[in-house]
């Protein structure tokens, strides 16, 4: 059977919050089977815990933020994407602030931390959510949908009237039975427009954003000296974000997710609709030889 996974060891890192601009320490720790991904705010007296769950999403302005009562954890999507890409089912995430650090704006630093900690298979079957009926959420010309598919595939399209984005391509499909999350998705960085920076900061957003943790474009070009990591890095990052948002379900998906000009808000609307439509999905597990796609197998050991 395909087994659940956790971290082999605890590991720590540090960075700044994209929106808060504050330094944050992050720790990733092993967790027992069927725990899921649970965030721990160590800066709150007595500690405060909140599980990654679509129903805990409280804000989707430029990032996915979860909350439960007075507890908030912001910008969870890049870390969640890395956990999904490496097949981590169970982990505790310790934070001494209100936001997951942005690192370099992609999922790659979180992938690196997880790889350094090591990955351990646990003695319990990994449960997948298999999509059995199509489901769609839309807002004007923006939409996201899930369809039955024996594997995991993500398609996304953006539509920005910008020369760099037009030249690089604004559509992509990634079939994870045929290619690697680590190669095709993990290094794609978040992006923003220089003309919007001041307005965002007046709203208390993007206070920690800079050329080290985001692609920044003016009206004509990319301002980062190193340029792009992929010619279509902008739309690949939307794939990265979507994978992170989808993983709030707590289980890997078997199905085809597609999106058009969408973002975190529609992703969450789709997940909430899915949870209400129990006829549109089912829990499944797989023997190794029958798995419709595989996860990265770097540094994986088996637990006793």
UniProtKB/Swiss-Prot annotation:
Gene3D superfamilies on file: lpxc deacetylase, domain 1 (3.30.230.20), lpxc deacetylase, domain 2 (3.30.1700.10)
GO molecular function, one term: metal ion binding
GO cellular component, one term: membrane
InterPro entries attached to this UniProt entry: Ribosomal_Su5_D2-typ_SF, UDP-acyl_GlcNac_deAcase, UDP-acyl_GlcNac_deAcase_C, UDP-acyl_N-AcGlcN_deAcase_N
Record protein name field: UDP-3-O-acyl-N-acetylglucosamine deacetylase
Binding, Zn(2+): 78, 237, 241
Organism: Acidithiobacillus ferrooxidans (strain ATCC 23270 / DSM 14882 / CIP 104768 / NCIMB 8455) (Ferrobacillus ferrooxidans (strain ATCC 23270))
Physiological role: Catalyzes the hydrolysis of UDP-3-O-myristoyl-N-acetylglucosamine to form UDP-3-O-myristoylglucosamine and acetate, the committed step in lipid A biosynthesis.
Name of the gene this protein is made from: lpxC
Family under the similarity heading: Belongs to the LpxC family.
Superkingdom to which the source organism belongs: Bacteria
Pathway: Glycolipid biosynthesis; lipid IV(A) biosynthesis; lipid IV(A) from (3R)-3-hydroxytetradecanoyl-[acyl-carrier-protein] and UDP-N-acetyl-alpha-D-glucosamine: step 2/6
Obligatory cofactor(s): Zn(2+)
Gene Ontology BP term (one): lipid A biosynthetic process
EC number(s) reported in the record: 3.5.1.108
